[in-house]
Amino acid sequence: MELLLLSNSTLPGKAWLEHALPLIANQLNGRRSAVFIPFAGVTQTWDEYTDKTAEVLAPLGINVTGIHRVADPLAAIEKAEIIIVGGGNTFQLLKESRERELLAPVADRVKRGALYIGWSAGANLACPTIRTTNDMPIVDPNGFDALDLFPLQINPHFTNALPEGHKGETREQRIRELLVVAPELTVIGLPEGNWIQVSNGQAVLGGPNTTWVFKAGEEAVALEAGHRF
């Protein structure tokens, strides 16, 4: 399988998806036809989100079609060489994808050679479940099981920083709480600016920041760019 799972879409001082464009270009391998799944968009319309994505990817020669615009979404997925899932609200993304019965066809198409690109919520959707999302508002997606293309749970936008005087939990504390009730999970705290690239059966960590791996009953493990999962 070919996956590009990004923690986020924007870095300080850079345009939207700018940091991701070289990564995407490097993994295209001649692919040009893409479907975009915009359902995580809540404060922007799906048309706006699709047009924005198409515009930024056009210089790479990628032709983007919004999945919500086609008469036969399953046929569009089958024909697609690239499946792109945008960030936003993970619950809304999973709900809409499940209601349209897109999860199994997307997973099957990626397993048969389509490149999967997802940032933030799109990276969450590639995991076994969406139980490590950060998102609100919460809508009922009728179950948390997701695409299960990547075997570990990703927590995107990972940071352990708290504003001065803030008394809420750190991100690590919240992940630790999850591991109490679901000790079978392994969670990757993926900071902004980092990504996981899967190609030829190898998953490789990229990005400038330390990534953390959390398991029940164990100390967190720090990983740097180049680590192979």
From Swiss-Prot:
Cross-referenced Pfam families: Peptidase_S51 (PF03575)
Residues annotated as catalytic: S120 (charge relay system), D135 (charge relay system), H157 (charge relay system)
UniProt keyword annotations, A-Z: Cytoplasm, Dipeptidase, Hydrolase, Protease, Serine protease
The protein's Enzyme Commission number: 3.4.13.21
Family annotation (InterPro entries): Class_I_gatase-like, Peptidase_S51, Peptidase_S51_dipeptidase-E
Top-level lineage group: Bacteria
Repeat is among the record's keywords: no
Protein's UniProt keywords contain Transferase: no
GO CC terms, sorted: cytoplasm
Family: Belongs to the peptidase S51 family.
Stated name of the protein: Peptidase E
Protein species of origin: Salmonella paratyphi A (strain AKU_12601)
